[in-house]
Structures are given as structure tokens and as C-alpha cells.
Regions:
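Extracytoplasmic ligand-binding site segments that recognize negatively charged/polar headgroups
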Residues: 54, 58-60, 85, 97-98, ...
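Periplasmic-binding protein-like
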Residues: 153, 213-222, 260-284
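Mature extracytoplasmic/periplasmic domains
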Residues: 283-342
Length: 367
């Protein structure tokens, strides 16, 4: 789905920047039908059960039902609110308790390093040839040995234009919004919130400059009294209901919110924003591996991937899915990055020292 055109979920060049940190490339051929690829040694499971652990409101209920109907496998879905919550859960359980989990790009690399993910060789599965070439050799999992691409997008913020005459354009505006917008919603996500604060004060992701780190902490301390909730769950619903008039949001959720309330506007901050990709992986202690692999293969069918993308309003890393996207997605201001905007940058993993800095700022902010 990566083409040099603005009719895609994200501008192709920016997606290439996100996933090409290890210099991948090449064109994209038409996706084959789901059953065209020889299965080799892979035998799909036709019964049993499995548990998917994913972000809140991030896997369509109708798609879960279709998976069970198509495969005979009962699917149970459980939810978390941040990559850090997922990591803590897997570390505490030694990778047990779930069959498929959905970490973001940098967290895939972290979990691989911690020996918490099972090697699956996604490209060798029957539908593995459907993985977009630009999504195959990614910096966090070269050759897709541990992960399958799910959806990708950006993190900015949204505000209600009916509540203020001011045009908000930056993270500085988000952290110090007009009084008439009231309380502010923010995510329960250390990487996103601290990263945005660092950008706002002229810093960068994984910054080690003591002055920038202190400035980010001071900014969040000043920001805290304006905060309504620190919760990634329910942001869309709170914005639509008017419980919050400004909140940090992912672009797909922002599109869904605007579809329900037309006065909501998504902002591409002038200081830059996170460009991320989420992925299906199998924890090392998964009990139902045949069912998990069947799920991964099923989700690499373009029709199933597109169904998720259309519901969630994000881009897909599966070839052929873009042809099945809803027309409104291809023209959405939340999905199509504005002409000339170059601030969307990939989230890369921080070192342990850098993570310690993030954690200290985050814990101070949460209080």
C-alpha cells in the first residue's frame, strides 16, 4: 500500500522513513488471494481457543467473530493501555498468559531482547508474502522473524474548534491551551507524553541533555493542574461527549471522533510527532501456538487486514489492503499528512539510561 501518492493512509515517503531504518526498499506487487500461496509445512488449526492481548478498542468485534467463523477457533480479547503495561505483564509472567500480543515498533525490539517473544518467521507463513516489501526489513525485526505488521499511524492531539477561536498548531499549545478549552486529556503512555513534552521544549526523543530533560519535567509540572485524565482508554468517547475539549490522540481515533462530532480538529504539531507501527507477536510462553499462527496468517489476508484498518481508521502493512480501504479514509485530514509536513518521525528505542530519564519525568508527572 506504499505508493508515492497522497491517496494513502499516510504519505509513502514518511512510512518509508519509519520502517526503513535498516535500508529496505523495492516495489510492491499485487497481493495474491489468501489461498494462492502453498502452505508448505504450515497446517492451520481448525479448533481450539486463543487469547489476544491488545490495545483498548483496537480489534473489531465483528472481525473477531469472523475469525471464529472462518477457522473454528474461539478468540478471547483482553486489553491494555500502553506498551509499558504490556511489557510489565509479560516480564511478570515470563511471557505466559496470552497467545498473541500487539506491541509497537520499539517495544517489539525490547521484547525480543528480553527473550519474551517466540520466533515465528512470519514471512514463511502462507500469507507472509502479502507483507508489504517496505514493511519486511524493519529496524525492530529484520525479516519479520518475530512479528506481523498490523496497523500504523501518528500521535498528535485534537481539540474542539467550537470552544475556542484560537488556532492551535503546536505541542506548546497543547501543554498550555486556551482557558476556554477547560481540562486536558492525556495518554497513560510514558513514551508519548514525555516525548511530546521534550519536543515542545526543543528536545528530541531519547534526549539526554539535562537542560532539556529538566525543561520537559517543569513543563509537565505546570501542565498537571490542567489535566482531566491520564488515560489512553476512552479518549475518543470523552471528546465526542464533550467531557474533554482537547486531548492527545492517535490519528485513527481522531478520525473516528470527528465522524461523530464535526467540530473536532486533529493537529499536526509544528515540533513534530510520533510515527508508529503496531505488530502481532507470539509471547514465548503462549499455550496455543498453532491457533496463534493461524490467527497471524489469517490477519495477513488483505481482506481481513483492510477490515481492521477501515474500522480503526489506520493504515495497514499488508499488500492489497489499501485497495479495500474506505474512500473517506483516502481523503481524511487525520490520515493524510498535510502537504509539506515533515515532522512525523519513527519512535525508536531508548537506551536504559534514556529510559530511566523518561521514567523519572513520568513518575514525577503522575505524582
Amino acid at each position: 500500500m506504499i505508493r508515492k501518492t497522497r491517496t494513502l493512509a499516510l504519505a509513502g515517503a514518511l512510512v518509508g522513513a519509519m520502517i526503513s531504518l535498516t535500508a529496505c526498499g523495492g516495489g510492491v506487487s499485487d497481493a495474491p488471494a489468501a489461498g494462492d500461496t502453498p502452505a508448505g509445512e504450515f497446517t492451520p488449526a481448525t479448533s481450539g481457543e486463543m487469547t489476544l492481548y491488545t490495545w483498548s478498542d483496537y480489534f473489531p468485534e465483528d472481525l473477531a467473530k469472523k475469525f471464529t467463523k472462518d477457522t473454528g477457533i474461539k478468540l478471547t480479547v483482553d486489553y491494555y493501555d500502553s506498551n509499558e503495561t504490556l511489557e510489565a505483564k509479560l516480564r511478570a509472567s515470563n511471557g505466559t498468559g496470552y497467545d498473541v500480543v500487539v506491541p509497537s515498533d520499539y517495544m517489539v525490539q525490547t521484547l525480543i531482547s528480553a527473550n519474551l517473544l517466540k520466533e515465528i518467521d512470519a514471512a514463511a507463513l502462507p500469507n507472509g508474502k502479502n507483507i508489504e516489501q517496505n514493511f519486511l526489513n524493519v529496524y525492530f525485526d529484520e525479516g519479520r522473524k518475530y512479528s506481523v505488521p498490523y496497523l500504523y499511524g501518528t500521535t498528535g492531539y485534537m481539540y474542539d474548534t467550537a470552544k475556542t477561536k484560537k488556532q492551535l498548531t503546536s505541542w506548546a499549545d497543547y501543554f498550555n491551551p486556551p482557558a476556554e478549552l477547560g481540562k486536558v486529556g492525556t495518554m497513560s503512555d510514558q513514551t508519548e507524553v514525555v516525548g511530546a513534552a521534550l519536543r515542545s521544549v526543543g528536545g528530541k526523543t531519547c534526549d539526554t541533555d539535562p537542560a532539556k530533560l529538566q525543561a520537559a519535567q517543569d513543563l509537565l509540572t505546570t501542565f498537571k493542574p490542567r489535566v482531566s485524565t491520564i488515560n489512553s482508554d476512552g479518549i475518543l468517547d470523552r471528546m465526542v461527549a464533550g467531557e474533554e475539549s482537547i486531548a492527545m490522540m492517535w490519528n485513527g481515533a481522531a478520525m473516528r471522533a470527528r465522524e461523530k462530532k464535526s467540530t473536532l480538529k486533529f493537529v499536526y504539531p509544528t515540533e513534530g510527532m510520533a510515527l508508529w507501527q503496531d505488530n502481532f507477536t507470539v509471547p514465548v510462553g503462549a499455550k496455543n501456538v498453532p491457533q496463534a499462527l493461524t490467527f497471524l496468517n489469517w490477519m495477513m489476508d488483505p481482506a481481513n487486514s483492510a477490515a481492521a484498518a477501515n474500522f480503526q481508521r489506520y493504515g495497514s502493512g499488508i499488500a492489497g489492503a489499501s485497495d479495500l480501504l474506505d474512500a473517506d479514509m483516502k481523503a481524511s485530514p487525520e490520515i493524510i499528512i498535510p502537504e509539506g509536513y515533515t515532522g512525523a518521525k519513527p519512535v525508536v528505542p531508548c537506551t536504559n539510561e534514556e529510559l530511566t530519564n523518561y521514567t523519572q519525568i513520568w513518575e514525577s508527572f503522575k505524582g
